[in-house]
């Protein structure tokens, strides 16, 4: 998908993170004035694991885009950016339950490291299921998000809301499952509503 880009940053010494982390990603000049220029800073998920030796940031850049993404689009290898306030908001929960990863579009990038972490060490996770909706049908990371019964991993991609929410309702039959949701605010609200109706509690 030509709109989706992954930027790989060299890892500064001693910089580490867990799967499911996000960071503040700042472009050059964000702190040049009296006050930080917030339009040059974005909250971004890290789409890699530390053992990949690079900090990956995956984002969708459309033709019409913000100042931030316009600058990002023109960055070249060797250009500098700043990262700060990095912390994990969705580490993989190991509670002997089934884990469901619900995402929209490029939100899937947040789950890439969780899946890799699960493949490396499946302790105390029964199985994992990913469901991603992308209306462009240009599905992401299909090398990793690929059903592998021997790893107890299933990956589903759908391109419309009807199929997506029907599938979520089916998954919600597992009242004991752990559900992760990543996408726009509207996507989160809709998913939480569907899950609650099915009796899944936060």
What residue spans do the PLM features occupy?
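Ferredoxin-reductase
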Residues: 1-77, 134
């Amino acid at each position: 998908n030509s709109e989706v880009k992954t930027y790989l940053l060299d890892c500064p010494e001693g910089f580490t993170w867990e799967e499911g982390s996000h960071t503040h990603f700042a472009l050059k000049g964000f702190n040049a004035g009296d006050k930080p220029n917030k339009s040059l800073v974005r909250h971004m998920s890290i789409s890699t694991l530390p053992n990949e030796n690079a900090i990956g940031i995956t984002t969708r850049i459309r033709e019409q885009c913000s100042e931030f993404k316009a600058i990002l689009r023109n960055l070249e290898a060797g250009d500098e950016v700043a990262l700060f306030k990095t912390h994990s908001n969705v580490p993989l929960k190991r509670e002997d339950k089934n884990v469901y990863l619900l995402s929209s579009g490029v939100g899937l990038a947040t789950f890439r490291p969780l899946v890799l972490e699960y493949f490396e060490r499946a302790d105390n996770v029964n199985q994992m299921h990913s469901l991603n909706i992308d209306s462009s049908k240009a599905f992401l990371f299909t090398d990793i998000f690929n059903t592998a019964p021997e790893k107890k991993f299933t990956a589903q991609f759908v391109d419309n809301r009807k199929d997506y929410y029907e599938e979520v309702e089916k998954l919600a039959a597992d009242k004991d499952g752990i559900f992760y949701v990543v996408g726009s605010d509207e996507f989160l609200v809709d998913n939480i509503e569907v899950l609650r109706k099915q009796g899944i509690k936060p």
